[in-house]
């Protein structure tokens, strides 16, 4: 569409019905009034209706024997799998539209520029940074939106500075070559000073990256699907060098040549390998794990302080306290008169004082045992992001997450949780806070968990407010845990972006020192 289009009764990916909505100019409009309507519906409809008879049989089998008639996914649509914002419009649109044509990307790589930069919302920006660092070019990333020389650069934008690379005479040509390979737009910036309070090129928001030196554990004991799609993603989306290490030999090899190690979903790791990895992480390494490997690393034999839900009920109040800090940190309503009053306020309210009916440890265990019976099979749930964290560069505020019977991660305040399950939706009709198992939801909010597929109400309650992605500093390094498999079948491009951020940006943004060869 060439202009903004105002429409009515639009369905969001969250399932909300919005009475009045404006489709921004430049959106892709796919009409369903055409011969391929059945195919379009099959690949783009947000939700597929499951027959009541099927739901009855599935629930009965789950309760009776713990079995299921579902395959490994009960949800699929392109926009959610790809992490794209989309809406369903219930009316035919025909004004301000033109036939879509693939547009060529234009780059202005001017020799005398002080900075060359690319937009961080483009997933190819991660590969742009990776391929330049592969050629030993110093690269920076902007962690807060700025405007330089009239160009708006959102957080996550990649910048190459002339002054960082004084000895590279053909820097301009290298930038141009990589941008052409990736078909990504690059802008040339003549001044590094942001207007007013926006970041400048010499400030703390222009952070220097570290060249990733990547290894992935594989071979016996690992899920071949997860190994394969992770390997493919490294090749296809980044196109830089990496090593495959036989996990049985990891404890005998020299890991110092790597600063990033990926552990795909797999079996438990022996004690000696765990000790080797812990020592490597403490020296500045970035360890990234998926699904079953995450399940092991969050056990009593693993690494770090992230725990699984079933092991936290004796400290549920502490976890809820930290969660409330996180939620209330997003609030913008301040009573300025009370704040500036010199007299002490005797009516200050605290989040936990308003709660009624908190659950005991025994009740939490009983509920969890029951709710665990109904965990989903490949459904899509809503992930809310921390929009200030570097792991969420280039992602929407609500990221669709493919979820099944995964380890449910619990993080205290000293562990980052860049993605949690559940989209906060304002609802002014809710006047009191509500309890969801171990956690609580402040007044004035609803929580949307399900986006697509079969998610029983019990499962929604069980996974609500848990972490899908965590990042914890250990020594000089860090451990990054994905509850699921971020590259499922190479199709979940939304969560794949989180994974690529972890690999390429982790060594520079999340660690304190280098792994020295």
Which residues fall in each region the model found?
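Intrinsic-disorder/low-complexity accessory segments
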Residues: 1-517
